[in-house]
């Protein structure tokens, strides 16, 4: 990422940030007050003390969690411009090994909760159309119609992700600016009827309502209040797409508009205590609007809901990309729609998110049921982020007293939200817990499986390539061995320009000697620039053993066979390697022979000596690798002559009992 560009605050940058970052938190007014009223038994069961106290809780929750923790503190904890819990972990992981656990737990929970955000926001917006009359027609007469429209919108949203966040942000930015202005305007109109509700700005009222008889659910009200700030973690994850400067500059306007709308809804509820009493479809957000504005509000809310979903999707792409880099997840195919490295698209994750979100819509069917499940997992993520931020502040030499205040203040607040949200478990929260556990299990297996493998791998797993060049050259010129290929290419990482896995040489020399005119060992290095296409070589003083280091930009297609053919032509032309004239060819004067690419996969050897737990970890990790990735596609070799070989992976000390010779019996 070009950090210099990203730090600049521009009008265009502000617009894009509003379009990408604030969708989730910006659509909370659609359902937060509805959830708070329903928690207490409906509009007929609430009074002024309850409404004022609840709004005070909302405003101070947003102030403390979103403004102070995320905008003022967390946005400073970026890693090369990228944010999110994994980026934060990358900054502090050297401080203590155990910090990997909050990173794994928090990341898995955030990805799981992201499946609910698109479902609940879009469904809530479309429910505003239910039973609305247009002339003599009612286009959306029931909940089934709502579900159909919701699913169509979600399918459209996931289908446009390939365009990239820059294009989407430029489209969504103006819409979200209109949305927040609309929230502020309508809220101010209702608030003007009773300015005394501004007493909700007093934090004492927020504390009092937790223990007031007017609040029938006690501290469990925090489960509904927390919905107002679920988008804070997504805000942090999306900083790589728009830059922290643009977020910090645009947040005050967004916060003011949100506050005005919550206050305005509160005034309307108090003015209409018997309105729609007992109606389960009641939503104060839409009811508080003038009737002639409702259709426009529903259309605008639907667009805002789509953008809310976008914030979670782009954040999920960033999280998964970072998780792969930290070896929490297998490597996945990443597409860069723009020249900014922070803007990515991961097709496999997009498909899984789409399937999970639509599945949740079918499972819960109504926004009320979704709200009951929403927010549980994200409280876990926020708590884990607090732990990692505490370590980050320590890394930055912040005064120990201030660090402890931060840890205990936000730890206590988020623990209360977590406890209150646990009440949601049986009402649907179990769904996100199951999804989070599944994602967390994959991360755990991949990370700790790699750790076991690296720790228990034989000390001689890597050998010096330059010590085998003589043997390879002799094999190349040994006419008694049949020719396997003119150019034999191994996709194998050569470390420090000389160390290579013994498996590679085992494949060439031990299984059945593979004779070739030239042996190529290719390492692909992805650079931070978008369109780099460079290479460097080391022949170790030979004409037929070549270590090729490819340096490809993150947007550059990894068509290794195309690049290698060009490299061979250049090396033959300058005499670095020998010419490869072809006697039989359709191309006169052709001086480059055939290519055979070899990809080596590991399989656990029966000789591996590990305890049951470690063996399960490594076997599961190898299984995940074979399931999740296709190296031939990754390196652009799907149409090349490619061989995938399996070689035994022997881990741990080998205690093989020797066999004794005896006489025939």
From Swiss-Prot:
GO terms for cellular component: plasma membrane. It catalyses: K(+)(in) + H(+)(in) = K(+)(out) + H(+)(out). Belongs to the HAK/KUP transporter (TC 2.A.72) family. The gene is kup2. PANTHER family: K+ POTASSIUM TRANSPORTER, OSMOTIC STRESS POTASSIUM TRANSPORTER. Transport of potassium into the cell. Likely operates as a K(+):H(+) symporter. It is found in: Cell membrane. Keywords: Cell membrane, Ion transport, Membrane, Potassium, Potassium transport, Symport, Transmembrane, Transmembrane helix, Transport. HAMAP family: Kup. It comes from Lactobacillus johnsonii (strain CNCM I-12250 / La1 / NCC 533). InterPro entries: K+_transporter (IPR003855), K_trans_C (IPR053952), K_trans_N (IPR053951), Kup (IPR023051). GO terms for molecular function: potassium ion transmembrane transporter activity; symporter activity. This is Probable potassium transport system protein Kup 2. The keyword Magnesium does not apply. The keyword Manganese does not apply. It is a multi-pass membrane protein. The chain crosses the membrane at residues 13-33, 55-75, 98-118, 138-158, 167-187, 195-215, 217-237, 250-270, 295-315, 344-364, 375-395, 400-420, 428-448.
